[in-house]
Amino acid sequence: MYSIKCDDNKVMPRERLMRLGAESLSNQELLAILLRTGNKEKHVLELSSYLLSHLDSLADFKKMSLQELQHLAGIGKVKAIEIKAMIELVSRILATDKTLTDSVLTSVQVAEKIMAALGDKKQEHLVVLYLDNQNRIFEEKTIFIGTVRRSLAEPREILYYACKNMATSLIVIHNHPSGNIEPSSNDYCFTEKIKRSCEDLGIICLDHIIVSYKDYYSFREKSTLF
């Protein structure tokens, strides 16, 4: 098995990282550091290059199962688990780094922040952002995971947290795992229902946003409901 240390003709990724910083490394080199060793056929840099060449984008890593990663990269289960764990950790770091504490200005700002967290989920998630009277998000609450159709029919829990936290307004977001962001008839019905229910309680429903891993649909921007 080829190690990351075996190439004497160039400065290897670890040494480049120590000398120049992680930001100076290519995707191939960063992945090689995570892989550490190659397989029987390929040096670790060749293996990382091969793996990247079979992906449309780095985001595809999040969508791959352990079995798919093992098969494509020709690596063992332990190494595949380590890579998946690192990918999840990076995802959580990004989500933390993009904590929604600033004032909300546009739907696209919200969508870009939430897409990183929800875009690759295999199940549908319904998330609500609760805002104060200065349009600052003070809480992000996952209301439901699983069959969003069932959740979309019942806004009671959404409004419970709004009243409990004395929210002035809220934004509803859910993902479409299929990647198709076009709203269904059920999405339209739910949006009308939650908007009416919010108005009855003096709470403003600012938007209902549907996200995928690369795009979003804003009812405020594209529908006549707002």
From Swiss-Prot:
The residue numbers the entry assigns to motif JAMM motif are 174-187
Task: Check the record and name the CDD domains matching this protein.
Answer: MPN_DUF2466
Q: Which PROSITE patterns does the record associate with it? A: MPN, UPF0758
| Record-linked InterPro entries | MPN, RadC_JAB, RuvA_2-like, UPF0758, UPF0758_CS, UPF0758_N
Gene Ontology MF term list: metal ion binding; metallopeptidase activity
Q: Which Pfam families match?
A: RadC, UPF0758_N
Similarity comment: family membership: Belongs to the UPF0758 family.
Please state what the protein is called: UPF0758 protein SpyM3_0777
Organism lineage reads as: Bacteria, Bacillati, Bacillota, Bacilli, Lactobacillales
